[in-house]
Amino acid sequence: MSRSIKKGPFIDLHLLKKVEKAIETGDKKPIRTWSRRSTIFPRMIGLTVAVHNGRQHIPIFISDEMVGHKLGEFAPTRTYRGHSVDKKIKKHY
């Protein structure tokens, strides 16, 4: 058994309070959070969480397959635009 299993899942307290409040009121607005390190709990299924990626908040609808993963896994922080092409290539016929 690895140490991380013994420690158990983690969720920020302020995010947990926001989730509980959204469940009580039945609010369907996205919950904005900067806590990418928080684990997705079963009580969060059906909610929309807007996770910050460093530039903007990305809305993520929580489904049952996501339970146990971290919120940051679903909001990529880096954009890959591809390698630049060499414009000096001449075609030889």
From Swiss-Prot:
Entry keyword annotation includes GTP-binding: no
UniProt keyword Protein biosynthesis, yes or no: no
Keywords per UniProt: Ribonucleoprotein, Ribosomal protein, RNA-binding, rRNA-binding
Coiled coil: none
Pfam families: Ribosomal_S19
GO MF entries: rRNA binding; structural constituent of ribosome
An example Gene Ontology CC term for this record: cytoplasm
Gene Ontology process terms (BP): ribosomal small subunit assembly; translation
Tree of life domain: Bacteria
Family to which this protein belongs: Belongs to the universal ribosomal protein uS19 family.
Function (record text): Protein S19 forms a complex with S13 that binds strongly to the 16S ribosomal RNA.
NCBIfam families recorded: rpsS_bact
Protein name, as recorded: Small ribosomal subunit protein uS19
Organism the protein comes from: Blochmanniella pennsylvanica (strain BPEN)
Taxonomic lineage: Bacteria, Pseudomonadati, Pseudomonadota, Gammaproteobacteria, Enterobacterales
